[in-house]
């Protein structure tokens, strides 16, 4: 077993400074009142955070390593837990600060990672000149945000112009994995105009386009607390999955014959989702509108 503590800065020393920039395009004023000339001024280009500090990770583990059957099998098992405090993230600034300042990195969350890692190695001979080595690896992982800064219910990352209905696809909230996907649940496609007319009001609804679930009025377990409001808006967004895999594993096979060897490797990742941003441009309204009428 073991215990250890590590720090991670993840930010440059410049993060503490508030910066100002000048430019006629962003800050100007006709100070002489002639309406024919403009004086260049300064504007805040980045908000500083002098209170930012290193992330701190505390890891504990226990495990064993065993050789079996005269060394033919090597088994390694490890159980571990990693608590990370003062996670550094760049979060949007309040609108009262304007649209120009870049956000600083701030310490905003604590996260838990825990899991089990297993490795089994089998070595043997196929003949006098041939031998093999087979390695199986597997890792089970649980990831969860356990706390946020006071006054913060959640924070989102990702830019609005690259996701469904111009809203962030990623939300970080207590009880969910880091960078969990958050958006609208797709029920299918509108087959015809009759389905569009019968469905809740939805921006850009039309035959051949995605149909979203009206889940407003339901709790996280999808129990109905009150009737749906009959429209698709931000209150219908929900958690769609995690980018963090629940299991990762692999198989490695190496065969040696004399002075030649052949090696192959298979890897798998299970239990996680991926966000295919190219689909935003090809499948989703409003970046993709499709044909309004059939030919």
Q: Model-derived features: where do they sit?
A:
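Conserved C-terminal beta-signal and adjacent last beta-strands/turns
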Residues: 133, 242-270
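Short helix/loop capping segments that flank catalytic or ligand/cofactor-binding pockets
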Residues: 10-11, 182, 263-265, 272-274
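Extracellular/periplasmic, surface-exposed regions of secreted and cell-surface proteins
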Residues: 1-174
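Short acidic/glycine-rich loop or secondary-structure boundary segments that cap or lie
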Residues: 145-146, 271-275
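Conserved small-residue
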Residues: 13-18, 27, 123-241, 279-295
């Amino acid at each position: 077993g073991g215990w250890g503590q590590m720090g991670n800065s993840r930010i440059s020393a410049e993060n503490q400074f508030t910066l100002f920039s000048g430019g006629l395009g962003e800050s100007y004023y006709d100070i002489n009142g002639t309406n024919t000339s403009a004086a260049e001024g300064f504007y805040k280009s980045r908000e500083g955070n002098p209170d930012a500090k290193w992330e701190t990770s505390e890891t504990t583990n226990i495990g064993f390593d065993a050789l079996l059957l005269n060394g033919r099998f090597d088994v390694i098992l490890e159980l571990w837990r990693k608590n990370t405090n003062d996670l550094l993230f760049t979060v949007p600034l309040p609108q009262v600060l304007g649209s120009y300042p870049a956000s600083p990195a701030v310490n905003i969350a604590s996260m838990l990672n825990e899991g089990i890692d297993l490795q089994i190695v089998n070595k043997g001979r196929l003949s006098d000149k041939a031998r093999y080595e087979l390695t199986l690896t597997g890792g089970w992982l649980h990831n969860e945000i356990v706390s946020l800064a006071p006054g913060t219910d959640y924070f989102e990352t990702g830019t609005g112009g690259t996701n469904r209905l111009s809203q962030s696809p990623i939300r970080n909230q207590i009880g969910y994995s880091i960078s969990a996907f958050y958006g609208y649940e797709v029920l299918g496609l509108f087959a015809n105009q009759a389905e569009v007319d019968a469905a809740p009001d939805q921006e850009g609804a039309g035959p051949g386009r995605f149909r979203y679930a009206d889940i407003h009025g339901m709790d996280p377990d999808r129990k109905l607390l009150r009737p749906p409001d009959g429209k698709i808006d931000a209150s219908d967004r929900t958690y769609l999955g995690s980018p963090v895999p629940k299991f990762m594993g692999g198989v490695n096979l190496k065969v040696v014959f004399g002075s030649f060897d052949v090696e192959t490797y298979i890897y798998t990742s299970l239990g996680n989702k991926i966000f295919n941003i190219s689909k935003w441009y090809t499948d989703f309204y409003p970046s993709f509108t499709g044909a309004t009428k059939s030919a």
